[in-house]
């Protein structure tokens, strides 16, 4: 879809308001993203948000690339797959 605006063709979103959430979307140009997060050790001195997810996009070489990740008290930890 070169030169055209992408549109969202699929979307989900849920948040319990207590530290847990998830969302996902897919666009008409093939981009996709999903993520879920949860509060770990709530109320303690070790409380931390842990997020897991992935996103996919088409590179300039025409290949699809997917990045999966975890982000928590140990930082952002991505992995790229093509």
UniProtKB/Swiss-Prot annotation:
InterPro entries: CHIT_BIND_RR_consensus, Cuticle_Struct_Prot, Insect_cuticle
Taxonomic source organism: Locusta migratoria (Migratory locust)
PANTHER family tied to this protein: ADULT CUTICLE PROTEIN 65AA-RELATED, CUTICLE PROTEIN
Domain Chitin-binding type R&R positions: 18-82
Name of protein: Endocuticle structural glycoprotein ABD-5
Residues the record lists as Pyrrolidone carboxylic acid modifications: 1
Pfam families named among the record's database cross-references: Chitin_bind_4
Transmembrane segments: none
GO molecular function: structural constituent of chitin-based larval cuticle
């Amino acid at each position: 879809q070169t030169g055209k605006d992408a549109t969202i063709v699929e979307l989900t979103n849920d948040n319990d308001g207590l530290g847990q959430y998830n969302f996902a979307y897919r666009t008409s140009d093939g981009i996709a993203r999903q993520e879920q997060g949860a509060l770990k050790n709530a109320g303690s001195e070790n409380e931390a948000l842990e997020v897991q997810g992935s996103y996919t996009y088409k590179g300039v070489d025409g290949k699809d690339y997917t990045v999966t990740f975890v982000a928590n008290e140990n930082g952002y930890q991505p992995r790229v797959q093509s």
